[in-house]
Amino acid sequence: MSTIFQDLVDSTVIKNAVQGQFTSLVSNNLVVSKVNSLHLFEIEKIQKDESSFPLDDSLQNEFSTSIIDESQAFMETNMHLIRTNEQTTYVLRLVSQVKVFGTITEISALKGKGSNGCDLLIMLTDYAKVSTLEWDMQSQSFVTNSLHYYEDVKSSNICSSHTPTQLLVDPDSDCCLLRFLTDMMAIIPYPANEDLDMEEAAIENSKISSSYAYKPSFVLASSQLDASISRILDVKFLYGYREPTLAILYSPEQTSTVTLPLRKDTVLFSLVTLDLEQRASAVITTIQSLPYDIYASVSIPTPLGGSLLLGGNELIYVDSAGRTVGIGVNSYYSKCTDFPLQDQSDFNLELEGTIAIPLTSSKTETPFVVLVHTSGQFFYLDFLLDGKSVKGLSLQALDLEINDDFLKSGITCAVPAGENLVFLGSQTTDSYLLRWSRRTTNEEVRLDEGDDTLYGTNDAEMDDMLDIYETDESVGSKRKIAYENGPLRLEICDVLTNIGPITDFAVGKAGSYSYFPQDNHGPLELVGTAGADGAGGLVVFRRNIFPLIAGEFQFDGCEALWTVSISGKLRNMKSRIQAQYSNPELETYLVLSKEKESFIFLAGETFDEVQHSDFSKDSKTLNVGSLLSGMRMVQICPTSLRVYDSNLRLTQLFNFSKKQIVVSTSICDPCIIVVFLGGGIALYKMDLKSQRLIKTDLQNRLSDVKTASLVSPDSSALFAKLFTYNETLNAKGQIANGMNDSASETDLDIQPNHKTSNNDQMGYDQSVSADDVPEVDNTIVTEKNVSNLDQESLEKHPILFALTDEGKLKVYNLADFSLLMECDVFDLPPTLFNGMESERTYFNKESSQELVELLVADLGDDFKEPHLFLRSRLNEITVYKAFLYSNTDKHKNLLAFAKVPQETMTREFQANVGTPRDAESTMEKKASSSVDHLKMTALEVVGNHSAVFVTGRKPFLILSTLHSNAKFFPISSNIPILSVAPFHAHHAPQGYIYVDENSFIRICKFQEDFEYDNKWPYKKVSLGKQINGIAYHPTKMVYAVGSAVPIEFKVTDEDGNEPYAITDDNDYLPMANTGSLDLVSPLTWTVIDSYEFQQFEIPLSVALVNLEVSETTKLRKPYIAVGTSITKGEDIAVRGSTYLFEIIDVVPQPGRPETRHKLKLVTREEIKGTVAVVCEVDGYLLSGQGQKVIVRALEDEDHLVGVSFIDLGSYTLSAKCLRNLLLFGDVRQNVTFVGFAEEPYRMTLFSKGQEALNVSAADFLVQGENLYFVVADTSGNLRLLAYDPENPESHSGERLVTRGDFHIGNVITAMTILPKEKKHQNAEYGYDTGDDFSCVMVNSDGGLQMLVPISDRVYRRLNIIQNYLANRVNTIGGLNPKSYRLITSPSNLTNPTRRILDGMLIDYFTYMSVAHRHEMAHKCGVPVSTIMNDLVELDEALSYM
């Protein structure tokens, strides 16, 4: 069997983060690492509306008192001061996202060690591979400077092979340290440039490259530092030392809670200084007899210095001289240690797993430490000083009166992210960018500032005001307030959504379609459990975007449509997009086009056709738009271009000659571009003074143009930076005068007077006098037009992007028609920059690769960036993201584009693929007079996004967010979409309208409740508790979820008595979980009913079972089965229960129609041991009880009767059924293949797995008539097994045979098989036939993955592609893609990874240039279209979701 492993949804958990200046010397970057990807963010300061920030009552009162009464005059004028509605905040903007062929363990930063003075990124992958990465501005990615490999190092400690690793960087970036194998340390020196070899630095005209900025590394054992150092717990570098100094926490003698009466305080703490030149070390001091439960140390920045030691029950500070001071945070510390501690046991904290982050800024005199508990609680620790020494510690909880309780679970990493910024990364909840401030009390503010509470509301705002208004007399008092360490306030600036860990999932009907029982063919969605603890909930995945249709009607013969907003007044151009949805004076028109006629309707509550207008209805319409910010409407027809005023009266008419066939058009206020067949191009520009179009023939400057697009420079800050930076380097005269109108007209052969004699402009234009054109009086300045004065007096000059027949991209600034960029684009290289040329080969002639359409548009939500879109003949969309890079020779910014990886196949399936040499004949068959229909449409506002809609048989919506690159989302539509346009109405705000091939026009709303920053759209539903299992009831169309919440735990015996009473008032009770079964409606995603289990009883497994309720009729009925565990402490045996629930119909609550279902308990059976898994087998209920598996029958619909059982391995964690075949996964003994029979009842053991595995999930995989088993273990490995008694390796069928194995890097938690959809069949090229299934799986890192069976022919082709890419792809960190997928455990196969292909590597095929694609296809002996068809088939395997 041949398969391919693919990622459907990227992992979302964040394991590590680091802040630095990676992209430039003035940037503030944050790099976060997920399982196998790096995300580089830019922390940007923006202004946001204050309404988006939740304020507590106290702050609201402060803000309300700061508003000045409008009745009070200001300086005896009519002006009044009011508080602005904008507030300064920070956001994370994604710069780059790269995949890594390795599991990222840790990352860190080397300050200032890059070739341009920027920081280097240090990445630790797998177990002991250290890579040095540097940001490359031209390729917009990280490049590898060095790779250090230490996995061959052996340790004398036999128990250290699976110990965690640590990656540390000295505060002065002098060296990097890797701790691995518990007590082994690899040190990589990074000296300053002046300390490098002088002979190397003296080379003429040479610069010291960062690639050689390190010296040879060396490995030390802990015993080489000091003979007593062993069993290291934690290592940190210390601040404030000239030489790199280590703080080592270790425990040579081990103890436990049981042996505390014999051995206490076994932890030691040593300060060791390193001599990198001599590779020597010296111990400065050692502190002994520290509490045994200390597990980590935190280095405190200067000026304080020292270390903070974290234990389960205490916090201890150690200064540079070895003096200690500590506190106990619960009542048990005195029983665990004899170390002297101050009593702060009222907190009742258990600090295991707590993350500590030291913070400091210019506003605080000394650093302080923020502690984040595993429950999500915040505490902060202040150091009480006596002179320069610390005399005590003060621990305080975060004041929830001035802070939101937003964190419901623990975090995994925390890093300072700039001045007063901190980033918290988590694996169980969302990650947050926070701004912190140590606010002063209101009393202190009033004492120093009187009644002025404006500066007391927010320290960040106060500093901004001080920078503007402070005087020498006021500096002292105001700065004194800023240095006061008052209560800590945390403000959420940005959130990175996390949906992991996912432990279970179910497939059900899409929520908004769930209450139509007569329709059983609605769209499906995948619903999984998300998060942990208080951050638990559900996550809803959909592969496609389902249009929410707000209205529809049929218009026979309609082929295209447009919407345009017209106003009779000149408005502010800068806010034209927002004004379209808020200005009541705007009128929106809908233009429909048939083959030979057009129609125009006034869009409102209804569509009313416009009568008595000059709008051309006797011709087909090619494009419609507006000019002069909505004052003019433009209609482009095959034979003419027409301009209308706000009353739809014709003001200008330009006729095209009969030989001029319009290929493409683009409208961008105030310009129009028309491209004709044969390469001709014409520019029409609106003159603001006369409000008339002026035509310019660009044939002398541009020729052989295939398609073109215009984009406004005002749409993005990128173009503003490009022009602003470059204009400052020009002559002052050019800056002052610019390119005035007359000069531009002279350069472009335009007549200064507007009475043109152009033959293309017909007589109708001559009959329109200048008096008939309404003019705007700019001489009168009023309150309404004062803000528009500058915009009205200046012209906008769009940027022209043109694609020529030779495949060249030319970019012009229409302000002076200067060439900004020219390069070859036909080869689709990874980056586009000025002057780039590609080598032409005979392969490039294949018609399917020919580019036929170009579009430049903005993508994004709150932050929009320009993108270049190129479409090939078979609808393959290539997206490039614009960026700027500096040219040091010319001292100017240059425009460039970087290719965005295509994660979804937009290309259409090409039937009847010919031979590899069919390209030339296909090109010859294509008539030169044909015109390709334009399919890409820019939607300026759809929901909260700027997007691009791709029409056709496979419609797509291309979206980008602040935290993601451009993503391709298929639109669910069985009928090809012909045309689309933005549309705004009361019932469809910021939506869109489209027409399909059946002439149905539909008005759609955009689903704002979904997130679009991953490969699939998803929606996170918070339930506020841990979710352990989920099942979907298909007839009632609701979800049953097993949940658990923590409560205080009391030890009781089997009779319920409390044998241990609490005698000490300072003692407190621990927490334990108790569970319930909740019914969740997919219509509102709320809990509509619950069943509470017994105290401390938690659900472990929830499943839908169709049980046989009649032996005569064999009738089956769906039930919800639940397996639970009852844990009451180590003194009482664990018990469990098997529950059976029926979902019944009831009268819904008033106003809540979703509450029409309730849970009804059918039966409960309690047994010894936990019930870890339940499932159905051929109409019977199966439950796994430890190592025993029991099959039960439902009798009389009220009780269960056991009919068969079997003893398996140690503890059954997974059970899957396929008819009467069963597959069980054990916690340590691999999988077991079992059969079940009814007459007589028996369970037969068929076969077992060969190796001892910790199985995390397992399931069947079907390909036609072949049956296989997919097994995932806790080490992140995936195995494909088969039952083959004829194979000698199976020992006559006693052992399952391994067909392939594959390292994933994630722990798979659940999997199931889903049908594989196949729409295309081609026997010649070996496409799949028969009934195939895909194995869909979820993992603990928030990802969704799939294992897809493929035919042998497809496997051979893609295997050649994989081997080619493994040697050609420039991998991040210098890692080998093939070695990453190898499993380290022994296997009987000579080639263990055979038959499982790496989808992440094969995805690079679409990223490669066209020439490389043809080279790979040539090695396979097939055309590129065949390879692309293979990828399309795989991409559409779950197209019904």
UniProtKB/Swiss-Prot annotation:
Annotated compartments: Cytoplasm; Nucleus
Chain intervals with Polar residues compositional bias: 753-763
A biological process from GO: co-transcriptional mRNA 3'-end processing, cleavage and polyadenylation pathway
Location, primary (coarse class): cytoplasm
Cellular component, GO annotation: cytosol; mRNA cleavage and polyadenylation specificity factor complex; nucleus
Keywords, alphabetical: Cytoplasm, mRNA processing, Nucleus, RNA-binding
MF terms (GO), sorted A to Z: RNA binding
Chain residue ranges for the region called Disordered: 741-763
Functional summary from the UniProt entry: RNA-binding component of the cleavage and polyadenylation factor (CPF) complex, which plays a key role in polyadenylation-dependent pre-mRNA 3'-end formation and cooperates with cleavage factors including the CFIA complex and NAB4/CFIB. Involved in poly(A) site recognition. May be involved in coupling transcription termination and mRNA 3'-end formation.
Name recorded for this polypeptide: Protein cft1
